[in-house]
C-alpha cells in the first residue's frame, strides 16, 4: 500500500483457520483462495505468499498489464439509517465491445480494528522479514486494516450490472444500496471498494476505493485506465 497508494487497494479476508473469531469472518465476501495462509492474490491473476519481495513484484506485473476500463464511484450513508450505504459506480470502456462480459461488484472494508492477537510465523526471523513481525513474539498484538466486512457480488459479479454491448467512453452507471453488517465497529473507518470483474478471464479489470460520507458531502474517487490491483 505504501509503495503504490494510488494504484493498490488491499482487502484482507480473515477466515482461513478454525480459531478465526466470528467477528472477523465475512461470509458474504465469498471469494476464497486455496492453499496455505497467509496467501495473496493480485487482480485474481497472480497468487503468492505475500512476503514483501513477492508482493511488490506481482503488483508491478499487474500494473504493467493495464486495463480496458476507467472507473469511479461515490458512497454515502442513507439519511437517518447509518447501517445502509448508497453507492454509485460509473465505468467507461476504452474501446467498443459487442461481446463484453463484465460485472460490477462491491465490498466494504474497515480499518483500525484492535483487540486481537495473531499467530506469528515470522517470530525470531524464522521465515525472513515481514514488515516488523520478524522482531515480535510468536503471538503478536495487531491493528487490523483493510478487513473485509461484507461483499456484494464479489465472487461472480452482479448479474446484468454491465450490458453486453458497450461503446467507447460511454458512461455505464450502476447504483445500489449496501446493508452494513453488525460486525462493523466504527462506521467512520469503513470504505467501499467498487470493482469490475472480467468474466471472460476471471480477473479484476479495475477497482476504486472511496470513503463513505454523509449525504451532501463529496467522496468521489476517479480512476483512469491504469490497472488497480486488489
Locations of the language-model features?
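Short, conserved sequence motifs used for protein processing/export or organelle targeting and
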Residues: 6-217
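Conserved redox-active cysteine motifs that mediate thiol-disulfide chemistry
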Residues: 1
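Residue-level detector of functionally pivotal "anchor" positions at catalytic/ligand-binding pockets or at interdomain
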Residues: 212-229
Amino acid at each position: 500500500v505504501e509503495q503504490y497508494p494510488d494504484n493498490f487497494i488491499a482487502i484482507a479476508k480473515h477466515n482461513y483457520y478454525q480459531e478465526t473469531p466470528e467477528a472477523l469472518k465475512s461470509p458474504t465476501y465469498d471469494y476464497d483462495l486455496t492453499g496455505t495462509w497467509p496467501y495473496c492474490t493480485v487482480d485474481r491473476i497472480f497468487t503468492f505468499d505475500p512476503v514483501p519481495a513477492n508482493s511488490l513484484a506481482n503488483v508491478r506485473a499487474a500494473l504493467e498489464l493495464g486495463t480496458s476500463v476507467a472507473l469511479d464511484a461515490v458512497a454515502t450513508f442513507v439519511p437517518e439509517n447509518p447501517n445502509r450505504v448508497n453507492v454509485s459506480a460509473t465505468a467507461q470502456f476504452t474501446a467498443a465491445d459487442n461481446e463484453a462480459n463484465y460485472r460490477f461488484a462491491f465490498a466494504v472494508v474497515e480499518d483500525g480494528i484492535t483487540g486481537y492477537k495473531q499467530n506469528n510465523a515470522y517470530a525470531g526471523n524464522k521465515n525472513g522479514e515481514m514488515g516488523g513481525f520478524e522482531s515480535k513474539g510468536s503471538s503478536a498484538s495487531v491493528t487490523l486494516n483493510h478487513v473485509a466486512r461484507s461483499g456484494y457480488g464479489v465472487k461472480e459479479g452482479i448479474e446484468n450490472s454491465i450490458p453486453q454491448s458497450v461503446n467507447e467512453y460511454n458512461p455505464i452507471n450502476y447504483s445500489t444500496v449496501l446493508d452494513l453488517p453488525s460486525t462493523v465497529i466504527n462506521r467512520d473507518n469503513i470504505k467501499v471498494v467498487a470493482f469490475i470483474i472480467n468474466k471472460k478471464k476471471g480477473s479484476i479489470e479495475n477497482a476504486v476505493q472511496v470513503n463513505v460520507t454523509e449525504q451532501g458531502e463529496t467522496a468521489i474517487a476517479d480512476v483512469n485506465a491504469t490497472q488497480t490491483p486488489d
